[in-house]
Amino acid sequence: MSVQFSMKFPPAVMVSGYDIIEDVDPIQGTHMMCFEPVLEEGEGSCKVLSLQELKMRAIEINGELGLRDLQSILICGGLINLSETHRIIFPGTILERRDSLHVPYMDCNGAGWSRGFLSLNEGFSRFDRFLCLC
């Protein structure tokens, strides 16, 4: 099943604090990007990254977790198969919350989309691999 969709990305920003996180919408913003899913991993520009790889790529920027620069390295989309569940991360916006960096994510499954925020300093339950366009 081929699905084409588009999403808006906010400018890369770092948000401090706890209360405003719920007001940040990872799919609203000024940067429009369109993704056309590929059928198999390795085709096109889709790559599966592990949590460790994601951290390593972030840490490589100036020796620390990159904030604005991370957007230029990882722009996320992925393989869309509505019969499976995929977690897609959006590192263009990174949130600082209680000394932990968070990135927005969306889960795609047969029931539709859900979204939230992931901490780069914590485990991601059963989602230990992420679909990213590099």
Where in this protein do the model-derived segments appear?
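A binding-site-centric feature that preferentially detects glycan-recognition modules on secreted/surface proteins
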Residues: 1-63, 69-134
